[in-house]
């Protein structure tokens, strides 16, 4: 089932950390989860062009702390911090809680599966050939030191009458190996022919357990 399950979810608690770092009892859990989803969607939609990879949410009492991982931190922060302040006020208004936002730069966007998937989707919307977009992304990632790369596009590719799935892969992407650091991203391209889904898997190497000194 390693082929079907979300690669990040499978590795949470093994080599990956949680994206929501809070605990709630059963009475509040659903409400807080829904609030998380609203926050993530709001940040993603408002800052889509900034290349947001992931958002980590921490909750302590009546406070919210957001770590926003982005390829373009300057775009999220804005001139003199104007954009990030506006974002903070939006979320405070939405939740009624005190909000702190940390902007974290993604060092290698070419090795971030979510950003790669969104980049390919953006190219498909600009009518660039899907094969060219996928191959270029794969070559860039492998040049940057990825151990393996897999990409898949599904839908009416090139405006074809019948939807199909096409993909490319290079190197090794062992989805069953839990110690393999597999990054996964998904994005959708809204074309005149309909939606095209883009999935990206990037193998960044194996994460070995730390050996304790005896």
From Swiss-Prot:
**What GO annotations for molecular function exist for this entry?**
mRNA binding; rRNA binding; structural constituent of ribosome
| Cited SMART domains | KH
User: SUPFAM superfamilies, alphabetically?
Assistant: Prokaryotic type KH domain (KH-domain type II) (SSF54814), Ribosomal protein S3 C-terminal domain (SSF54821)
* Short name of any one Pfam family annotated for the protein: Ribosomal_S3_C
| Superkingdom of source | Bacteria
KH type-2 domain location: 39-107
Cystine pairings recorded for this chain: none
| GO annotation (BP), single | translation
Q: Which InterPro entries match?
A: KH_dom, KH_dom-like_a/b, KH_dom_type_2, KH_sf_prok-type, Ribosomal_S3_C_sf, Ribosomal_uS3_bac-typ, Ribosomal_uS3_C, Ribosomal_uS3_CS
A single Gene Ontology CC annotation of this entry is: cytosolic small ribosomal subunit
Give UniProt keywords alphabetically: Ribonucleoprotein, Ribosomal protein, RNA-binding, rRNA-binding
Q: How does it assemble?
A: Part of the 30S ribosomal subunit. Forms a tight complex with proteins S10 and S14.
NCBIfam families assigned? rpsC_bact (TIGR01009)
Please state which protein family the record places this protein in.
Belongs to the universal ribosomal protein uS3 family.
What does this gene product do?
A: Binds the lower part of the 30S subunit head. Binds mRNA in the 70S ribosome, positioning it for translation.
Q: What is this protein called?
A: Small ribosomal subunit protein uS3
Q: Which organism does this record belong to? A: Halothermothrix orenii (strain H 168 / OCM 544 / DSM 9562)
